[in-house]
Design a protein with these regions (language model features):
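Active-site anion-handling motifs in enzyme catalytic cores
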Residues: 1-205
């Protein structure tokens, strides 16, 4: 049902985001299909977004499939942005300080996609937003960074590189002082495995 639609994934609904989605639908001439965070602490998200065609409980497969098959994607979720990049979908993201603006800026700056972020209080789509994105330079940058990271790890593991605390301080420090995984940590690990399995299943379909 996502084909030919703007799909949104909104973690923190607000009046401004609601107006933005309606404006995007009007300007791009596409119907909306909306998804929200459905954790128990966010049970009122449906009411706060207050838009038709909002899924009450999207399954993992539906969530991924909607992003994969949509015409355009709008989100205030960092992980939503990540999957838009993986699936090479045209997207806009709404700055979300509640969820950590730094990682949004870091990723988008790295890929030279700063223009894909809207301010937190944006109520309207910028003029002349294209329905497509040229992912060739984005994918090239991603491949470069992945290759550099893989090379760094291989050198660190083989002893060719001195993997000191100064070189990757926080990562090493956390590794050295890591405690046995908590129940929450085990659940997160299981969730990542389920997400990976769902992703590969969607890709094969």
């Amino acid at each position: 049902a996502a084909k030919g639609r703007i799909v949104s994934y909104i973690l923190d609904p607000a009046a401004e985001k609601r107006k933005l989605l309606l404006d995007a639908s009007s300007k791009l001439g596409l119907p909306l299909l909306n998804m929200v965070d459905i954790q128990k602490k966010e049970v009122d998200n449906l009411g706060r977004l207050n838009l038709p065609n909002t899924m009450k409980e999207a399954t993992l497969y539906e969530w991924l499939g909607n992003i994969l098959h949509c015409e355009f994607f709008i989100t205030d979720s960092f992980h939503g942005v990540c999957f838009a990049l993986i699936f090479n979908k045209p997207f806009l993201c709404i700055n979300n300080p509640m969820r950590g603006s730094g990682r949004f800026h870091s990723l988008l700056n790295l890929l030279r996609l700063q223009d894909r972020m809207l301010p937190e209080d944006a109520e309207a789509l910028p003029e002349n937003v294209p329905l497509t994105m040229d992912y060739a330079p984005v994918n090239e940058l991603l491949e470069q960074k992945i290759s550099q990271s893989r090379e760094w790890l291989q050198q660190a593991f083989s002893g060719e590189r001195d993997a000191t605390l100064e070189e990757y301080s926080r990562l090493t420090e956390k590794k050295l002082t890591r405690r046995p995984p908590s129940r929450w940590g085990r659940l997160r690990k299981k969730g990542r495995k389920l997400l990976a399995r769902a992703y590969h299943r969607i890709r094969r379909s």
